[in-house]
From Swiss-Prot:
PANTHER family: AMINO ACID TRANSPORTER (PTHR11785), SOBREMESA, ISOFORM B (PTHR11785:SF512). Residues 33-45, 120-126, 173-193, 252-269, 349-352, 410-411 are extracellular. Changing C168S: Retains 25% of the transport activity. Residues 1-11, 67-98, 148-151, 215-230, 291-327, 374-388, 433-438 are cytoplasmic. Monomer. Belongs to the amino acid-polyamine-organocation (APC) superfamily. L-type amino acid transporter (LAT) (TC 2.A.3.8) family. This is Serine/threonine exchanger SteT. The lineage of its organism: Bacteria, Bacillati, Bacillota, Bacilli, Bacillales.
Amino acid sequence: MHTEDNGLKKEIGLLFALTLVIGTIIGSGVFMKPGAVLAYSGDSKMALFAWLLGGILTLAGGLTIAEIGTQIPKTGGLYTYLEEVYGEFWGFLCGWVQIIIYGPAIIGALGLYFGSLMANLFGWGSGLSKVIGIIAVLFLCVINIIGTKYGGFVQTLTTIGKLIPIACIIVFGLWKGDQHIFTAVNESISDMNFGAAILATLFAYDGWILLAALGGEMKNPEKLLPRAMTGGLLIVTAIYIFINFALLHILSANEIVTLGENATSTAATMLFGSIGGKLISVGIIVSIFGCLNGKVLSFPRVSFAMAERKQLPFAEKLSHVHPSFRTPWIAISFQIALALIMMLISNPDKLSEISIFMIYIFYVMAFFAVFILRKRAKGEKRAYSVPLYPFMPILAIAGSFFVLGSTLITDTMSCGLSILIGLAGLPVYYGMKKRKAS
């Protein structure tokens, strides 16, 4: 097993890790996606099956990464795993895409979305939405610099906060609803494509792997990582299935498809009156804020880990740990600075979508890594073994290939741009390698 002492405080326990998994996955998708998944599925049975299948594929990936993470319990997650298994080149490319485009783009997109929702809720006008988003990102930057435990407190609080409206809809929807759950969607409003339905659920489940980036700050990663990954993904899968059951008990399948992104707020209004719509709006805002905090907490650990290995310019600065807070404060500031630039001059949401193709290539490589590590350490005792081996890793690989294939067919240009983003890091990689050699 590979361990490290990077000077960061080991403050992450099971509750923090669980809320990080749940909080970084559940954003707006649980409120916005049911209509789209139902439209693609054609009927409620297939829609519920799509949510279940998406959860199973994600769980397979999570359990596979948990085995790798217990063998390489280091800060950096996916980047670190690829470097340890495939070498410095592939690790660098993975880290490059995450820190230059993917991470800051997701932080920026969530910040802008949060600002827009806050402005709409309080009637402040769209002109203030970007300012609110920037303030939120800066606030979370400061919180996570002054202590990982404070970021963890925000994560726990927002996870509980987002689960309250979800729980209300599930409980009261199943209790008070009077619709037949298993119904079909009219062909005139359906767009039958079960593959697209699964793809929509997989994107709604995305974000779970960010827990792995904090391996070096866990109190006992060998036990904690698999427990948090398994528990968190099972909870999220159950939430997604139950809220769809509840919606189908309140609204007909046709109504959910027709209402689209407004289906959940309409269902809440039917259950709780005019306050119901506000409840959902607040739930989405808290959800986005918690998701944003999880990204601010975890993405900078990749640039910190790369800087520790002298793979980035200004590595000495980026790998600096604050003497009092014991957090990678310069790495956090660097990632937030990139996110703020994207918020000001571009469309971060589109940038994150463009880079997703390369990220899934790295997912496939990480899932294959479990076979390589087992071969290297044949006969050695493992702290954790993925259950149903080799079925689970193969299932995870199949799910990732499905995402890659679907994305390649539906958005070929974005896939090409994604590859170019990865290749753009090559001059930096060879430049830093030459500098280290000299």
